[in-house]
């Protein structure tokens, strides 16, 4: 009887059917609630259509929004000598992508009124311009890291 739990292998992520892009597929999966992937897909593609009606290339706006929201540094709690310190650390590339997607989705959900499709397209557009709720969240995280720079020597 083995003592270790068996670790299940991760299923590979399928690219989305319209753009064949893994990042969009991950974004759709993160937007999805209660397993309703079709609804999440309609929301994302509808937001892309809204961006297209504004005269923008939706794929470029999406990529620019994701890249501009990605955090470079974040704080993590580290216990040293009975005290917890917020230690600034670099963010791994996979986590950068996850955090930027999460922040964009949360900022879109926090917007008031209208449909989720319109809120998401507005948030993507603003993030690509360097504005919006997701960019505020990124700046907040960077400010926290800057404020706790004195504890950077606790990195491991």
Where do the protein language model's features map onto the residues?
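Strongly charged
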Residues: 2-34, 38, 45-156
């Amino acid at each position: 009887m083995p003592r270790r739990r068996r670790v299940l292998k991760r299923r590979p992520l399928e690219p989305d059917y319209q753009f064949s892009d893994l990042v969009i597929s991950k974004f759709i999966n993160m937007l999805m609630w209660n397993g309703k992937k079709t609804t999440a897909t309609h929301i994302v593609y509808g937001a892309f259509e809204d961006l297209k009606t504004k005269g923008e290339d939706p794929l470029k706006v999406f990529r620019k929004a994701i890249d501009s929201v990605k955090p470079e540094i974040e704080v993590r709690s580290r216990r040293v000598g009975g005290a917890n310190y917020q230690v600034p650390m670099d963010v791994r590339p996979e986590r950068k992508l996850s955090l930027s997607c999460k922040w964009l989705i949360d900022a879109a959900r926090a917007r008031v009124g209208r449909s989720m499709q319109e809120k998401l397209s507005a948030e993507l557009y603003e993030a690509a311009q360097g504005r919006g709720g997701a960019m505020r969240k990124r700046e907040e995280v960077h400010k926290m890291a800057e404020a706790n720079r004195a504890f950077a020597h606790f990195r491991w």
